[in-house]
């Protein structure tokens, strides 16, 4: 009498290895075996063909040996007299498998699926012939073909042709045949989205109203109970899987397994295009999109496409303005967790990124990468306009705006535009008067963290930047760069009005105010205006009577540093500034500059009322009294 055929089970399609056979496989082949078995089981579950059994996935994820799989199949006969698999009669399997009469099992997606024992035996027979039973036919170490891949083409063709009419997706076929079938696209009946085989199956199950695996906390539905169990741990915070190397905890065993590869150095997933290896299959899949150029994730706001969903999610925060990450110290909010982590080092003073060459530490990884270019000297990015080279592409992009005069960053408050985003961010703080970075030594506050870092050097007395030409040391790298131009004679900053060149950009900016007549710095006491902030600062000392610069030799005090420097020459009798024309020497460089005008006949100071010119500013000031 013909028996009713039960539902297909995971063990029906599982390829088993004995303990002796298992020893013939290398680590990569064992990983491949587990991945294939896990994928097949999950596809069966997603189709509703077998009951989700956590013990099976647990065994595979925990990397237990495959011969621990214990099957409970019973053998029965179908109406044709062939042997077929009869599964355990659980409540759900009965619901899915025990159809009226002798009808074959029909899964949730509506296509007929039968797999007879005789077909499975073909697999087992071929594997034993080509495999290594009891070490009688050991696998060669030089062989690149795993036992899983040695199923003959005749057997594969037999199964493919037989079941192709029943289902196109073929989730249980060998990987080689799945590759052919995957070329065909599959469409979800709910919202029309197109998937490849496994994705379409999973997606269809999610839409199925009969799906029982729903999270009671957030309403999210899952295709199998194991995924729901893992998901629930997000709400409970449970992390039952612990790494014995470092003690780190994980919510799922698969995450632990992936993490442990950091300690072992194992990278079993290899890219066939460039031979690069990866710890996880998901990282390999992401990497392969570099070769294919595939960017499947599209922003519906601006149509920009991305090769990773994480990049799309991050990008969408630009449109929404969402900044979910808040600093618990100062309340500042960020769009990315990485930005928050970098910011928090301001409060902690932590510098986790250390240079292996010189031991210098940095709070931000990007700063370390920039610093390492000093040691390597590598500058692969070249400007086509001026041939200047840069260590990073972003530096080149910023530099090129000098040539294009592009200023894409505009202030919404005053309309001022900038070529660099960092300049705009710095400028915005002038509207708010925000100075979040405070010195814990003297209480001085700064708008920028870099300004605070530079200020710290005043207290420490540290001058880490040394000139290789003369040995002079500086607090700031920019000061060393400017100083170095004394030796090279380089003056890269040129005035477009008169062609005068300068070694510093700040000197050019000050000079250009002569042409524009701009004097933006005004004294609150007397209303006098100046074209440089330093001139205003020096002037304000007249009102306060302050003389902060004191001579350590005689105690005489001065308003400005230059006055003290000139005075110190009296004590040392040092006259280091010599005129090359006549040999006369001076204690101050400014005195030499004034003297040098006698030889060249330069008279740069002009009276605006009568156009008379003078070689010294003091002579002009004295002359202007005639008009007043």
UniProtKB/Swiss-Prot annotation:
The keyword Nucleus applies. Coiled coil: none annotated. Gene3D superfamilies: 6.10.140.140, Classic Zinc Finger. Signal peptide: none annotated. It is found in: Nucleus. GO terms for molecular function: DNA-binding transcription factor activity, RNA polymerase II-specific; RNA polymerase II cis-regulatory region sequence-specific DNA binding; zinc ion binding. A zinc finger (C2H2-type) spans 213-235, 241-263, 269-291, 297-319, 325-347, 353-375, 381-403, 409-431, 437-459, 465-487, 493-515, 521-543, 549-571, 577-599, 605-627. GO terms for biological process: regulation of transcription by RNA polymerase II. Keywords: DNA-binding, Metal-binding, Nucleus, Repeat, Transcription, Transcription regulation, Zinc, Zinc-finger. Residues 8-79 form the KRAB domain. Its main location: nucleus. Pfam families: KRAB, zf-C2H2. The keyword Coiled coil does not apply. CDD domains: KRAB_A-box. GO terms for cellular component: nucleus. May be involved in transcriptional regulation. Belongs to the krueppel C2H2-type zinc-finger protein family. This is Zinc finger protein 528. The gene is ZNF528.
